[in-house]
Amino acid sequence: MKSIEVVAAIIIYENKILCLQRGENKYDYISKKYEFPGGKMELGETKEQTIKREIHEELNMHIDVEKEFITVIHQYPDFILTMHSFICKCDNPILKLTEHIDSKWLKVNELENLDWAEADIPIMQRLMSCQF
């Protein structure tokens, strides 16, 4: 089975967290699900560099990476995903969607109301147990 390693940004602005909705996908089980933004590392990149690049490419935002949060290993039907999540901050919540179909800035206690991609659920649950 194919393995994919990615990074994800938990972007916080004024005590709200950015949640993005994926578009249509060849894999039904992640199509139109919410997720934390991020992507795959390029050769020679650190995880922090990858997050900054991906967020700039996908959202036209600049972020500060504060600290590593949790790593999730999730087996989907077609691949195994290892996702390293990081707490990030931004100074400006304005973004431009280039790959996603919706964005929401939510308080921690509102996160569970979204239909999350399965690999992102452990991150969402851990966030709900934290104080921001």
Locations of the language-model features?
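NUDIX/MutT-family hydrolases
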Residues: I87, K96-L127
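Conserved S-adenosyl-L-methionine
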Residues: K67-T71
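Conserved Nudix-box catalytic region and its N-terminal flanking loop in Nudix hydrolases
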Residues: K16-E57
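Active-site-adjacent beta-strand/loop module that shapes the phosphate/pyrophosphate-binding cleft
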Residues: H62, V72-I94, K104
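Conserved hydrophobic "DFG−1" position in protein kinase catalytic cores
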Residues: I11-I12, C19, C88-C90, W105
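Conserved N-terminal beta-strand and adjoining loop/helix that marks the start
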Residues: M1-L18, K40
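Short secondary-structure junctions
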Residues: E58-V65
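Generic C-terminal helix-cap and adjacent flexible tail
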Residues: M128-F132
